[in-house]
């Protein structure tokens, strides 16, 4: 129901801060973007939201996605993109072409969305995915639909798409990954070099996570 959706959105900031420390600005940015989308300020043929979480390892990017799905009462579907670095990885996500083994089985991604059309889709370490997968994501962010190898169409209009990336984390500080005295946001230079403009321009928001300070770690 609509009143429950808005109440859950108001609760999201409070809930996430209980599990993720030192990332208030990132959580606020995500919450505002989702509120705008759910208020009808988005195109009907696009996902609810398409977000890139950028920041060092261990600062709460994946945890925020998990808590978001719990708060909104949505299924969390997660793919580790380090497993999809090869060219044939696209076939695993949307199904093998006709004549290839596994053609009748469809794809892991399309099957998951067909079964759970209302969900949070989490693609961890997206920078490791093969370039062909980015072409698939452009289709998803453009038209909120994807047709698998068997002709079935997966509808992404009620999906919150979240991708995480560690790109540029080495520039945050010289200490261990995820922990640094320098709490400034990641510069956009590394992201610009890694992700093509047509990909970045289709994102609703690049949510930048800061490195954790010593005070936050000691909580």
Language model features with spans:
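Short, exposed "boundary/linker" segments that immediately precede the start
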Residues: 1-3
């Amino acid at each position: 129901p609509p009143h429950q959706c808005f109440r859950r959105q108001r609760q999201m900031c409070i809930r996430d801060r209980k599990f993720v420390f030192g990332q208030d600005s990132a959580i606020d940015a995500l919450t505002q973007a989702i509120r705008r989308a759910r208020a009808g300020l988005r195109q009907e043929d696009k996902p609810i939201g398409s977000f890139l979480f950028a920041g060092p390892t261990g600062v709460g990017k994946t945890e925020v996605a998990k808590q978001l799905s719990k708060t909104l009462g949505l299924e969390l579907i997660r793919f580790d993109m380090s497993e999809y670095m090869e060219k044939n990885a696209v076939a695993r996500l949307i199904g093998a072409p006709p004549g290839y083994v596994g053609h009748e089985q469809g794809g892991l991604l399309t099957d998951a969305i067909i079964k759970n059309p209302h969900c949070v889709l989490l693609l961890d370490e997206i920078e490791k995915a093969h370039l062909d997968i980015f072409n698939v994501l452009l289709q998803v962010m453009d038209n909120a639909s994807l047709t698998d190898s068997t002709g079935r169409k997966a509808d992404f209009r009620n999906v919150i798409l979240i991708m995480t990336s560690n790109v540029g984390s080495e520039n945050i500080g010289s200490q261990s990954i995820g922990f640094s005295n320098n709490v400034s946001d990641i510069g956009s230079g590394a992201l610009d070099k890694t992700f093509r403009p047509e990909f970045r321009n289709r994102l609703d928001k690049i949510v930048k996570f800061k490195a954790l300070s010593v005070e936050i770690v000691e909580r």
